[in-house]
A protein has these predicted regions:
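Conserved GNAT-fold acetyl-CoA-binding loop/helix
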Residues: 32-52, 63-65
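Short loop/turn motifs at secondary-structure junctions and domain boundaries
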Residues: 56-60
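Acyl-donor (CoA/ACP) binding surface of acyl/acetyltransferases
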Residues: 1-36, 68-190
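Short coil/turn segments at beta-strand junctions that form active-site/ligand-binding loops
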Residues: 61-63, 129
């Protein structure tokens, strides 16, 4: 069993391992899930992202993790924290959080449950001073969720990314400080 990093009431968040790419390709790489994330990816692209995440954990002690549903043992998504590594972003090196939930598990509170745990982990265990999250204005569900987490819109961090559909530009960012989180903390699945 890969290393468990975080455990919540319904989820296990564990480190990504090489064999996870095929599972993510099959279950998370759908047109609906990937619509505002640059579209469906090739398996080699997912493998490259997984390799990056494994190296982040080895080098910095954090990265993205697979979300495993305790009741079924099934993959329901992935989430975590990484460094902003898009060279077009004005804040390269900041700590960025992100999430992805399988389409048939939407609206069950898994994003909220996992990200509340990830944010606690980032501030309390890793010791980051603040977090950012990146999305597009078109991805209203994503930025509304960022607001629900207590994050604030940061127009000064917007940037254009030609790798994405023009409808998904500019990339927009939200941020959350440790102090904000202390007053905004999640209360559980919603």
């Amino acid at each position: 069993m890969p290393d468990i990093v975080i455990e919540t009431e319904r989820l296990i968040l564990r480190k990504i391992e090489e064999s996870d790419a095929a599972l993510q390709y099959e279950l998370l790489n759908t047109p609906a899930v990937m619509e505002c994330l640059g579209g469906v990816k090739e398996l080699h692209e997912i493998e490259a992202k997984h390799a990056k995440s494994m190296s982040w954990f080895a080098r910095e002690g954090f990265g993205f993790m697979m979300l495993i549903e305790k009741s079924t043992g099934e993959l329901v998504g992935h989430c975590g924290m990484k460094r902003v590594d898009n060279p077009l972003a004005p804040n390269v090196g900041d700590h960025e959080i992100g999430w992805l939930v399988r389409e048939d598990r939407w609206r069950r509170g898994y994003a909220n449950e996992s990200m509340c745990a990830v944010i606690d982990w980032a501030f309390d265990s890793i010791g980051v001073p603040y977090l950012v999250a990146i999305t597009s204005e078109r991805n209203e569900a994503s930025w509304r969720f960022m607001e629900k987490l207590g994050m604030e819109r940061r127009k000064d961090l917007d940037f254009d990314d030609p790798a994405y559909d023009p409808r998904d530009n500019p990339a927009i960012q939200y941020s959350l400080s440790r102090e904000q989180w202390e007053t905004e903390k999640c209360s559980g699945p919603a």
